[in-house]
Amino acid sequence: MKQITLHVYQSLDGCPVGADKHFDAAAEASCCVLIDEETYLRIYLNHLGWPLTAKETLVVTDGCIDLTEKERVRFVTGDAAAELRGIKADGEGTVTAYGAETGALLLDNGLADEIVVITVPVLVGGGEKALECGLNDDRTWVVRSSKVLEDGKIRTVYGRVCP
Protein backbone atom coordinates (compact mmCIF):
# COMPACT_ATOMS: atom_id res chain seq x y z
CA MET A 1 0.00 0.00 0.00
CA LYS A 2 1.26 3.46 -0.86
CA GLN A 3 1.83 6.07 1.84
CA ILE A 4 0.54 9.59 1.21
CA THR A 5 2.67 12.36 2.69
CA LEU A 6 1.15 15.84 2.73
CA HIS A 7 3.63 18.73 2.60
CA VAL A 8 2.54 22.03 4.16
CA TYR A 9 4.54 25.25 3.88
CA GLN A 10 3.53 27.95 6.32
CA SER A 11 4.65 31.16 8.00
CA LEU A 12 4.98 31.49 11.77
CA ASP A 13 1.35 32.66 11.88
CA GLY A 14 0.09 29.71 9.82
CA CYS A 15 -0.36 31.47 6.48
CA PRO A 16 0.64 29.72 3.25
CA VAL A 17 4.06 30.28 1.73
CA GLY A 18 5.46 28.72 -1.45
CA ALA A 19 7.15 25.34 -1.55
CA ASP A 20 10.89 25.22 -2.09
CA LYS A 21 13.81 22.85 -2.62
CA HIS A 22 12.66 20.70 0.31
CA PHE A 23 9.49 19.84 -1.62
CA ASP A 24 11.48 19.28 -4.80
CA ALA A 25 13.64 16.69 -3.02
CA ALA A 26 10.58 14.92 -1.58
CA ALA A 27 8.86 14.90 -4.97
CA GLU A 28 11.94 13.44 -6.60
CA ALA A 29 12.11 10.61 -4.04
CA SER A 30 8.42 9.69 -4.35
CA CYS A 31 6.60 7.46 -6.82
CA CYS A 32 4.23 10.27 -7.87
CA VAL A 33 3.13 13.80 -6.98
CA LEU A 34 -0.43 14.79 -6.00
CA ILE A 35 -1.52 18.43 -6.33
CA ASP A 36 -4.69 20.47 -6.80
CA GLU A 37 -5.78 22.51 -9.81
CA GLU A 38 -4.56 25.84 -8.42
CA THR A 39 -1.10 24.44 -7.73
CA TYR A 40 -0.97 22.82 -11.19
CA LEU A 41 -1.76 26.13 -12.89
CA ARG A 42 0.71 28.07 -10.72
CA ILE A 43 3.54 25.62 -11.44
CA TYR A 44 2.79 25.60 -15.17
CA LEU A 45 2.64 29.39 -15.43
CA ASN A 46 5.74 29.98 -13.29
CA HIS A 47 7.84 27.58 -15.34
CA LEU A 48 6.23 28.29 -18.73
CA GLY A 49 5.90 24.56 -19.12
CA TRP A 50 5.77 21.45 -16.98
CA PRO A 51 8.93 20.83 -14.90
CA LEU A 52 7.83 17.59 -13.18
CA THR A 53 8.47 15.20 -16.07
CA ALA A 54 10.37 12.43 -14.27
CA LYS A 55 7.27 10.90 -12.67
CA GLU A 56 3.51 10.93 -12.83
CA THR A 57 1.66 13.93 -11.41
CA LEU A 58 -1.94 13.52 -10.25
CA VAL A 59 -4.05 16.69 -10.36
CA VAL A 60 -7.29 16.85 -8.36
CA THR A 61 -9.71 19.00 -10.36
CA ASP A 62 -13.36 19.39 -11.29
CA GLY A 63 -12.56 18.98 -14.98
CA CYS A 64 -9.69 18.36 -17.37
CA ILE A 65 -7.58 21.49 -17.81
CA ASP A 66 -4.70 19.73 -19.52
CA LEU A 67 -1.98 22.17 -20.55
CA THR A 68 0.65 19.44 -20.55
CA GLU A 69 -0.59 16.89 -23.09
CA LYS A 70 2.78 15.23 -23.65
CA GLU A 71 3.85 15.07 -20.02
CA ARG A 72 3.03 12.53 -17.30
CA VAL A 73 0.00 14.33 -15.84
CA ARG A 74 -3.24 12.55 -14.90
CA PHE A 75 -6.41 14.33 -13.80
CA VAL A 76 -8.40 13.01 -10.85
CA THR A 77 -12.02 14.09 -11.33
CA GLY A 78 -15.38 12.93 -10.03
CA ASP A 79 -15.15 11.14 -6.68
CA ALA A 80 -11.54 12.11 -5.97
CA ALA A 81 -11.48 10.48 -2.52
CA ALA A 82 -12.54 7.10 -3.94
CA GLU A 83 -10.03 7.33 -6.78
CA LEU A 84 -7.24 8.25 -4.37
CA ARG A 85 -8.15 5.29 -2.13
CA GLY A 86 -7.67 3.05 -5.17
CA ILE A 87 -4.34 4.67 -6.06
CA LYS A 88 -3.18 4.32 -2.46
CA ALA A 89 -4.11 0.62 -2.36
CA ASP A 90 -2.29 -0.14 -5.63
CA GLY A 91 1.38 -0.92 -5.10
CA GLU A 92 4.09 0.51 -2.89
CA GLY A 93 5.91 3.82 -2.50
CA THR A 94 5.20 7.33 -1.32
CA VAL A 95 2.83 9.83 -2.90
CA THR A 96 4.03 13.38 -2.22
CA ALA A 97 1.05 15.74 -1.89
CA TYR A 98 0.94 19.54 -1.85
CA GLY A 99 -1.70 22.27 -2.04
CA ALA A 100 -4.43 23.62 0.22
CA GLU A 101 -7.31 21.87 -1.55
CA THR A 102 -5.33 18.64 -1.77
CA GLY A 103 -4.58 18.83 1.96
CA ALA A 104 -8.23 19.37 2.84
CA LEU A 105 -9.30 16.45 0.63
CA LEU A 106 -6.73 14.10 2.14
CA LEU A 107 -7.37 15.05 5.75
CA ASP A 108 -11.15 15.21 5.49
CA ASN A 109 -11.17 11.67 4.06
CA GLY A 110 -8.51 10.08 6.27
CA LEU A 111 -6.11 9.51 3.36
CA ALA A 112 -2.95 11.23 4.64
CA ASP A 113 -0.48 9.02 6.49
CA GLU A 114 2.07 11.70 7.28
CA ILE A 115 2.21 15.50 7.33
CA VAL A 116 5.49 17.34 6.80
CA VAL A 117 5.22 20.96 7.93
CA ILE A 118 7.91 23.43 6.90
CA THR A 119 7.60 26.61 8.98
CA VAL A 120 9.28 29.67 7.49
CA PRO A 121 10.43 32.29 10.05
CA VAL A 122 8.28 35.17 8.73
CA LEU A 123 4.93 36.68 9.68
CA VAL A 124 2.55 37.06 6.74
CA GLY A 125 -0.76 38.10 8.31
CA GLY A 126 -4.20 37.76 6.80
CA GLY A 127 -7.00 35.29 7.23
CA GLU A 128 -5.86 32.58 4.82
CA LYS A 129 -4.34 29.50 6.45
CA ALA A 130 -1.89 27.04 4.92
CA LEU A 131 -4.05 24.11 5.97
CA GLU A 132 -7.81 24.44 6.22
CA CYS A 133 -10.02 21.42 6.52
CA GLY A 134 -13.14 20.38 8.35
CA LEU A 135 -11.80 17.62 10.53
CA ASN A 136 -14.63 16.28 12.60
CA ASP A 137 -13.28 13.03 13.95
CA ASP A 138 -10.79 11.98 16.59
CA ARG A 139 -7.69 11.37 14.48
CA THR A 140 -4.50 11.73 16.45
CA TRP A 141 -1.13 12.85 15.07
CA VAL A 142 2.24 12.54 16.81
CA VAL A 143 5.54 14.29 16.14
CA ARG A 144 7.94 11.83 14.50
CA SER A 145 10.77 14.32 14.07
CA SER A 146 11.61 18.00 14.18
CA LYS A 147 14.67 19.72 12.76
CA VAL A 148 15.95 23.25 12.20
CA LEU A 149 17.06 23.43 8.56
CA GLU A 150 20.11 25.28 7.26
CA ASP A 151 17.99 28.20 6.04
CA GLY A 152 16.32 28.79 9.43
CA LYS A 153 13.14 26.94 8.53
CA ILE A 154 11.77 24.26 10.83
CA ARG A 155 10.77 20.86 9.43
CA THR A 156 8.33 18.91 11.59
CA VAL A 157 7.04 15.48 10.58
CA TYR A 158 3.75 14.24 12.02
CA GLY A 159 2.57 10.65 11.75
CA ARG A 160 -1.01 9.48 12.00
CA VAL A 161 -1.78 7.27 14.98
CA CYS A 162 -3.92 4.38 13.82
CA PRO A 163 -6.59 3.13 16.23
In which residue ranges do the predicted regions lie?
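Enzymes that bind and transform nitrogen-containing heteroaromatic metabolites
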Residues: 1-163
